[in-house]
């Protein structure tokens, strides 16, 4: 019988010094981020200031009260060909094939008169919402949560900047609430007695979602207390422990692209667990026109740099490649 693999080491980092601590405390946090992202690729952010109980309450209420008719009317194009949207909307369960459901929404600043909305720029969509009389607190909460978790992500990026040997405001100009392409996804995994078929990894592990790299700058995830994630390490696949009210943070592919893979996106996957749970990732993105110059932190000097690329083009190509590899979520 094989020996069970030990869980991956995922440190918990108090990020509060990044919001006003002294230089030494900020440097210490940056060193902890650096170590985590160079080892397992994940860390938990504590003292983040977000009310996660309210987050759970609102998301559970939303998934509990959505009707089948509402889900279809708001479904993205992959599920409802009458809807041209490919990002914002409902991602439906498919009877006998797929049980997980989710709602994705984008920047509340993307109003009808936003320049990128008016021009029809790819990856930009003004949000649609479920009936606001039936779901009275959903839209106001979601829009405020977007602003809150975007602000949290900008704080985290100060730590990443310092970890990379840059000034703490290095990423600030690339992260504007007016044009960020960041997305929130509210994923609900149900418990079902007759669960539809699931995928199987090469090692025989039953999976809800196969191995992948997140397409983002960083991903900031809140999840309920059901262990499900695994990260690929030199020793094989290891479980990522859960951590109560803390947010799980990892680098996305753009961070690897930008830093010459000094901070690579960790390869991870979702185990099949037949238990009701929530997985609520925030994918941090720059704006469409943002162009950052890739660079080499100390350990990667001598390697050829990636060419600069407009962020919106990078996001579109990488997102399409992920869907082609792993299928529509």
Swiss-Prot record:
Name its co-factor(s).
Answer: Fe cation; L-ascorbate
- Provide the catalytic activity annotation: N-[(5S)-5-amino-5-carboxypentanoyl]-L-cysteinyl-D-valine + O2 = isopenicillin N + 2 H2O
Q: Which SUPFAM superfamilies match?
A: Clavaminate synthase-like
Identify the residues that bind Fe(2+): 212, 214, 268
Q: Which residues take part in binding isopenicillin N?
A: 87, 91, 189, 279
Q: What class of enzyme is it?
A: oxidoreductase
A Pfam family of this chain: DIOX_N
Q: Which UniProt keywords apply?
A: Antibiotic biosynthesis, Iron, Metal-binding, Oxidoreductase, Vitamin C
Name of the molecule in the record: Isopenicillin N synthase
Source species, please? Streptomyces griseus
Lineage, top ranks: Bacteria, Bacillati, Actinomycetota, Actinomycetes, Kitasatosporales
What would be the name of the gene that encodes this protein?
pcbC
